[in-house]
Amino acid sequence: MIRTTGIAGAGIFLLATMLSMRGKPTLSEISKDSSADYPAKIERLDPASNALIPEHAMWHPLANGFTWVEGPVWIHSGYLMFADIASNSIRKLDANGEVSIWLQPSGYRGQKPYGGTEPGTNGMTLDRTGRLTVAGHAARNIMRFESMDPHGTVTILADSYQGKKLNSPNDLVYDTDGSLYFTDPPYGLRTQSDQDPDKELKINGVYRIPNALQHKAGAPPDRDRLQLLISDMERPNGIAISPDRKWLYVSNSLPKKWMRYPLKKDGTVGPGTVFQDASGDTRVGSPDGMKLDTRGNLYATGPGGIWIISPEGKHLATILTEKATSNVAWGGKDGSTLYATTTDAVLSIHLNAKGIQP
């Protein structure tokens, strides 16, 4: 999630004040989008993209009226969930296109006013038993819901490293062995900066929770087992694992690059390399959330929209959204629908590829 990186602390608080004055969108203002489908603009850079994107691909507007949404995840019983960060809520988009609040507050629950612009949660995924696992963002933890009852048991899987609070976990992915990987930039802190007074860690890391799948429901975090894998990224953000389990992908929002790390048998990683460099692209948006299809192609939000990058690192195409795009998720009846969250809306597009779903 990226919104205000590089703005001085005073600017952050001014923006927070402006948002407070205009008010958070109410549920009545947020609803299914009744506007018509429209042709997707595709920047095709390689003929291989033709096998992935239909010639007449269409965007389907699903919901609008937000300030900034993130973390879409398809629930196998047939609906989409996503994080409405500014309103500190997790929302549900049902099969009829109706939007409802699933949980509020979802992230920050402190006694004093939050003071920043992003009090909610962020990325979401499912473990292989179907339990919703959430990057807490302003809550500064990783949490797992033991059922789809938002007021049921919630298990905190991680909240600190070596005795210091996590910054603001942003996005996450499960490995096939049940381990959980997540990124931890400062975007959920009040000033979103490395100088934030609440920031306890000097790094913005990428972590692994070994065998998170087996963590007992309701048990406290096993803090001694949390592994720091990557500590030299400025703004780690989106994260994904290749279908052959050979590579860990991490998007770095500053500078605008996607990194790739060899994934070892023990779950740790080797030295990373730049997988794709977008630092020269001045279009709106930066590397953020991403997912893979079954062929290993990466669908990564970035400048201009959604970049499709081959397993060899070739930029095949960009599906243009022409607005800041935060994340994507595969879903739908056949797993070929790609859902996207943007500045103010949730959209979907049907592709020829089939996605890897949690």
Describe each model-derived feature in a short phrase.
Residues 21-358:
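Sequence-structural signature of mature extracellular/luminal beta-sheet repeat domains
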Residues 5-6, 18, 27:
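N-terminal compositionally biased, intrinsically disordered segments and leader/signal-like regions
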Residues 2, 19-22:
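Position-driven detector of the extreme protein N-terminus
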Residues 1-10:
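Bacterial N-terminal signal peptides that target proteins for export
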Residues 9-17:
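Bacterial N-terminal signal peptides
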